[in-house]
């Protein structure tokens, strides 16, 4: 199980790198789908089944609509591929930043790795994902407002990610 979680975390990082160093909006969609599927599988392996399902539906339902909109506005006649030197340079620099962050975090001592599942306390504990559903309906107004602002911010981030070096998705239509 530990190797499976490590494999999922490696795939999640690779999906994030694919989104961050996308040469074209078409490839950014592939990285987003990979990162969302692997991230939800990671949560599912840790016992958070409901939150995993909700995030999977939000990511593939909402974010793919944003990417389709962005691809329609910022379509390139000749999209770059993964093998271009600029894209490889972006990927290598992102991996370098990630490795340096892990090294510095290891020296400072702020990295504590461990896997704890949701229902590892015992029989009398309440699963956290089911109590999260109750929080949606009891005092979740502020949480919904924060989530809405986060999704709006994510929309603008994705629109800027797909624009490339030329005029992109945020322009006068």
UniProtKB/Swiss-Prot annotation:
Transmembrane segments: 1-21, 27-47, 48-68, 91-111, 139-159
Cysteine disulfide links: none
Membrane protein topology class: Multi-pass membrane protein
This enzyme's EC code(s): 7.1.1.2
Domain of life, source organism: Eukaryota
Role this protein plays: Core subunit of the mitochondrial membrane respiratory chain NADH dehydrogenase (Complex I) that is believed to belong to the minimal assembly required for catalysis. Complex I functions in the transfer of electrons from NADH to the respiratory chain. The immediate electron acceptor for the enzyme is believed to be ubiquinone.
Descriptive protein name: NADH-ubiquinone oxidoreductase chain 6
Organism: Fratercula cirrhata (Tufted puffin)
Taxonomic classification: Eukaryota, Metazoa, Chordata, Craniata, Vertebrata
């Amino acid at each position: 199980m530990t190797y499976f979680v490590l494999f999922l975390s490696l795939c999640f990082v690779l999906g994030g790198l694919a989104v961050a160093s996308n040469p074209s909006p078409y490839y950014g969609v592939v990285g987003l789908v990979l990162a969302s599927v692997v991230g939800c599988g990671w949560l599912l392996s840790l016992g958070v089944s409901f939150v995993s399902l909700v995030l999977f539906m939000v990511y593939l339902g909402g974010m793919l609509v944003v990417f389709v909109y962005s691809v329609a506005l910022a379509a390139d006649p000749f999209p770059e591929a993964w093998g271009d030197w600029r894209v490889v340079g972006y990927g290598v620099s992102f991996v370098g930043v990630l490795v340096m962050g892990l090294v510095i975090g290891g020296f400072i001592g702020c990295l504590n790795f461990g896997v704890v599942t949701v229902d590892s306390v015992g029989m009398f504990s309440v699963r956290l994902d089911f109590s999260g559903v109750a929080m949606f309906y009891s005092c979740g107004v502020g949480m919904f407002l924060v989530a809405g602002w986060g999704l709006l911010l994510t929309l603008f981030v994705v629109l800027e990610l797909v624009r490339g070096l030329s005029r992109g998705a945020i322009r006068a239509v």
